[in-house]
Amino acid sequence: MRQTTIIRHKETDKKWFVVDAEGQVLGRLASVVASYLRGKNKPTFTPNVDMGDNIIVINADKVVLTAKKEDDKIYYSSSGYNGGLKAINARDLRAKKPFALVEKAVKGMIPHTKLGRKQFGNLYVYAGREHNHEAQKPEVLEVK
């Protein structure tokens, strides 16, 4: 009788990938990135172990939003105090923090737990083409 193989954190093989977000639809890009951050692309996926890869997203300022979401999509944040609710649309958020659109989309697609926060820490988003992770020799990840 076979038993399920349990993978430990030490046995995981983490790789580095770089994704070019230029011309990519935000949600489709975020779902692929979230899947790789969790490690769901690996045949030995274990939900309670951080076995995801490190992902570098470049050109995050050139990601595409479909339909009228550029003006209609609202991002909310709260200070926690009465009257402390702030709202900003996607166009203004892109102008203020170009990397935040991709970060918020990916963050919503990974678990909201301690492990999810650790996996989210393996995401590096840059607005331009330049990044400082060349020493890790990242492989190019094509998003269809």
Curated annotation (Swiss-Prot):
The record's section on SUPFAM superfamilies has: Ribosomal protein L13 (SSF52161)
Task: Please give the InterPro entries that the UniProt record associates with this protein.
Answer: Ribosomal_uL13 (IPR005822), Ribosomal_uL13_bac-type (IPR005823), Ribosomal_uL13_CS (IPR023563), Ribosomal_uL13_sf (IPR036899)
One example of a Gene Ontology biological process annotation: translation
Read off the Pfam families from this record: Ribosomal_L13
Could you tell me the keywords of this UniProt record? Ribonucleoprotein, Ribosomal protein
Q: Which GO terms describe its molecular function?
A: mRNA binding; structural constituent of ribosome
One Gene Ontology cellular component annotation held by this UniProt entry: cytosolic large ribosomal subunit
What the record says about family reads: Belongs to the universal ribosomal protein uL13 family.
- PANTHER family attached to this UniProt entry: LARGE RIBOSOMAL SUBUNIT PROTEIN UL13M, RIBOSOMAL PROTEIN L13
User: Subunit info?
Assistant: Part of the 50S ribosomal subunit.
Cited function? This protein is one of the early assembly proteins of the 50S ribosomal subunit, although it is not seen to bind rRNA by itself. It is important during the early stages of 50S assembly.
Report the protein name in the record: Large ribosomal subunit protein uL13
| The organism of origin for this protein | Mycoplasma mobile (strain ATCC 43663 / 163K / NCTC 11711)
Upper taxonomic lineage: Bacteria, Bacillati, Mycoplasmatota, Mycoplasmoidales, Metamycoplasmataceae
What is the gene name? rplM
